[in-house]
C-alpha cells in the first residue's frame, strides 16, 4: 500500500485533507473556465461547480447540493460539442467532486481512479487550454507546473496514500502521469 497514513476513509482527518485540496482544485479548474464560457455562452454550470468546490474548501458541508453541482458540470461537458469546452467542464466537475474522494480506496485501479479525482481538475484544465491553443503542449506543461508548484501539502499527503498514475499512451493519461510525478517529486524534495 502506498500510504504514509492509516486508511483515511470517511474520517475527519480525510475531510481535513480534502478541504484545502478542493480549494487548489477550484483554482486549477478556474484556469480553463473561460475556454468553456467562450464556447458555451451563458451556461453557468461549470462556474457554479467551481464555486461549490471553493465553498467546501472554505468549510461548507459536503452535501447533496455539492454533488448536484458536480453532476450538472458533468452534464455541461457531455452536452458541449467542443472538445476543449468538454474538458474545461470536466475540470470543474472534478473540482466539485474532490469532496467525495474515497480516500479508503487506495490500492490498485480503484486507488488510481481516486487519485484522478484529485489530479483531474488540473489535468483537464491543462488539456482544455492546450486544445483551445491549437494543441500547444507548452500551455498544458505550464499549467501542470503551476499546479504542482501550488499544490498544498494536503494534496501531496493524499497522493502518497494512493498508487502513482501509470504512464499510459493517450495524451490524457500522459498528463495524469506527469502531474502526479511532479507533485510526488516536489513532496520529497
Residue ranges: model-predicted function:
Residues 2, 150-189:
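Acidic, carboxylate-rich catalytic segments that either coordinate divalent cations
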Residues 2-148:
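Structured binding/interaction patches within domain cores
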Amino acid at each position: 500500500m502506498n500510504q504514509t497514513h492509516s486508511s483515511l476513509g470517511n474520517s475527519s482527518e480525510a475531510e481535513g485533507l480534502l478541504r484545502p485540496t478542493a480549494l487548489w482544485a477550484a483554482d486549477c479548474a478556474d484556469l480553463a473556465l473561460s475556454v468553456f464560457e467562450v464556447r458555451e455562452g451563458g451556461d453557468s454550470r461549470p462556474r457554479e461547480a467551481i464555486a461549490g468546490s471553493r465553498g467546501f474548501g472554505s468549510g461548507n458541508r459536503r452535501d447533496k447540493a455539492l454533488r448536484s453541482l458536480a453532476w450538472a458540470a458533468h452534464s455541461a461537458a457531455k452536452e458541449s460539442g467542443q472538445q476543449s469546452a468538454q474538458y474545461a467542464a470536466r475540470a470543474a466537475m472534478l473540482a466539485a467532486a474532490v469532496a467525495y474522494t474515497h480516500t479508503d480506496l487506495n490500492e490498485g485501479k480503484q486507488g488510481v481512479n481516486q487519485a484522478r479525482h484529485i489530479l483531474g481538475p488540473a489535468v483537464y484544465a491543462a488539456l482544455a487550454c492546450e486544445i483551445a491553443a491549437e494543441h500547444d503542449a507548452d500551455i498544458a506543461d505550464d499549467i501542470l507546473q503551476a499546479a504542482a508548484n501550488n499544490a498544498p501539502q494536503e494534496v501531496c499527503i493524499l497522493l502518497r496514500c494512493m498508487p502513482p498514475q501509470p504512464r499510459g499512451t493517450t495524451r490524457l493519461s500522459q498528463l495524469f502521469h506527469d502531474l502526479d510525478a511532479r507533485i510526488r517529486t516536489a513532496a520529497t524534495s
